Amino acid sequence: DDTAKSGVVRIGKSADMTSFKEFVGKASTDSYTGQSVYKVTATGLEPNTVYYYVYGSNGKFSSPVMYRTLSTEKFKLLYISDIQVSSDVEDGREESYVWQKTLGTALDQNDDISFIVSAGDQTQHGDRANEWAGTLSPAALRSYAMATTVGNHDRKGETYPFYVNNPNEYRGTTPANVDENYWFRYGDVLFIVYNTQIFNVYDQYQFTLDAIAKNPDATWRVAVMHHDIYGTGHHAADDDNKLLAAIYSALIDRFEIDVCLTGHEHLYGRSFFMKDTKPVKDQKYNADGAVVDPVGTVYFTASSASGKNRIEDYDYEWLDFKYVSEEPSYSTIEFTKNSFTLKTYGVDSKKQIDECKIVKTDTSYSPVDPNYKGMDTDMLQRYLGKWYVIIQIAIEVARYVV
């Protein structure tokens, strides 16, 4: 309804909606497509509770939709990337179908998923409503929250921010053409979601510092970004990826990030634990095969959730595991206060492809000064120590100026 000034969501605990709490949002207009967009934020939901909600405007509402909250003490999430529905071929129907199959299979096999993390490239062109329609077409998405990440294809247009409603956005000195960095907390886990289209070292450092300073009691720190800085395929050798590796590897080392979830490559893989840009292969394991108090950070790269996988066989020094297959896959990640377990499955075979387990006996981190306004020296050295960084900076400046 283009005449509505605001969107409304009503949430209750029974499907007949006789009792509910109402949340009112604001309307905006997508400057590219002219569509009206309504964003509503609901608060106060309790864990382990079944809710029903309706949405609408001007007194007209949808049918009730069920939404179930689960525990925050221990939980499981679904990790995918590169849905990347493209309207160039069959209006995106085949890719939408494969994406629905991937999501449906994952949820059928895991009825205890709390929410979904997408590591970027939700659509192919970033400016087409029909591609977003394909990405958001699975009915299951109405009952699950999905934390999205800006990818290089999302930045091709300006529609991305009209389809997401992210919390705790950080607006730095460099303008983002599509959306900002943001963070969110679920239980003991702090998720730090980066827009890797932003090359500003200072902004990314201050954003990370701000997120961590506001969550000093988190026992896990998870970075989510689109570009696979320790990835599986040809993109890992691209100049922009090398630039990003210089920025983010130092950032992740400095703030002792435990796990980094990425996409971009359309090819599943897992790095060794990385520190100071080098694999740390000498780790301590328990009887269950879990890494105990690891040194460094492990980086994961997801395949394409819509089946647009690449068949490439690269042997990078940082790669511990890779799965070269046209079969789409998905990963589940289970957290407790002291443990992390990632399992990856093939969509067609339903067989487990990979597993990575971490156990912490010490959940503390080095202290940070929330008032520090400088920049990490090692981060700056890595950033400026690459000849291609200077070229890339010039390209980025030219892009904003022209």
Where are these regions (language model features)?
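Alpha-helical segments with a strong preference for the paired helices of cellulosomal dockerin domains
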Residues: 101-104, 108, 373-402
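Active-site neighborhood of phospho(di)ester-bond hydrolases with catalytic His/Asp-centered motifs
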Residues: 79-81, 115-121, 125, 145-152, ...
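Active-site environment of divalent metal-dependent phosphoester hydrolases
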Residues: 85-89, 123-128, 152-158, 180, ...
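Extended active-site neighborhood of metal-dependent phosphoesterases/phosphodiesterases
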Residues: 36-42, 50-66, 130-221, 247-248, ...
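Core catalytic region of metal-dependent phosphoesterases/phosphodiesterases
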Residues: 96-156, 254
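Acidic, histidine-bearing metal-coordination/catalytic regions of metal-dependent phosphoesterases
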Residues: 1-89, 108-109, 326, 336-375
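Acidic/histidine-rich helix-loop elements
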Residues: 20-33, 78-101, 165-173, 231-238, ...
